[in-house]
């Protein structure tokens, strides 16, 4: 399941996905459908439609998050070459021959994505609050998309998670911040 498929290229960034990515998104359909039916009194059909829109928007906003990293990477002179979707989340791909970079460069690149999703979540929040008392596909979709962007891709991206095979932006920032401070202590 490590094979990647090319989806498209945006701003010279190649976007790929794995079969596991498709599976993990599809796995979200039953819980989102259940939540829509339970919390918003959606019918089964409405829950399925809302779930479809939610997972499509999750995928799109994950790409927007990564394109924020691509913009930051380009601005520091060491651009990204790809985005690899391996589950609900994705990884920034950099050239294999990239030279060792100073910690500040890694930190600037890691800071490129979260703020976009905070803004998306905040921009959708008034609509989410307004629509919360209105049942329907649009209401549930907007509420879920606002929450996903603000809490997961925005604030969640800043958590200092860094363990084998899974590092989020906050983990990268903490790792290179410690490295930067070690270098200062030596000097």
Name each region found by the language model.
Residues 1-187:
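Hydrophobic transmembrane alpha-helices and their immediate loop junctions
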């Amino acid at each position: 399941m490590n094979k990647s498929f090319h989806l498209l290229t945006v701003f010279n960034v190649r976007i790929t996905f794995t079969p596991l990515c498709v599976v993990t998104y599809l796995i979200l359909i039953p819980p989102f459908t259940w939540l829509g039916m339970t919390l918003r009194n959606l019918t089964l059909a409405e829950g399925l439609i809302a779930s479809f829109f939610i997972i499509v928007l999750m995928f799109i906003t994950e790409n927007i998050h990564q394109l924020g990293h691509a913009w930051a990477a380009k601005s520091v002179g060491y651009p990204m070459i790809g985005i690899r979707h391996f589950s609900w989340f994705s990884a920034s791909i950099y050239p294999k021959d990239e030279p060792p970079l100073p910690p500040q460069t890694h930190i600037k690149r890691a800071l490129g994505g979260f703020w976009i999703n905070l803004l998306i979540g905040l921009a959708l929040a008034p609509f989410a609050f307004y629509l919360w008392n209105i049942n329907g596909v649009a209401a549930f979709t907007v509420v879920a998309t606002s929450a996903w962007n603000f809490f997961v891709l925005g604030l969640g991206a800043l958590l200092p998670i860094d363990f084998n095979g899974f590092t989020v932006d906050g983990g990268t920032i903490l790792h290179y911040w410690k490295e930067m401070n070690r270098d200062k202590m030596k000097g």
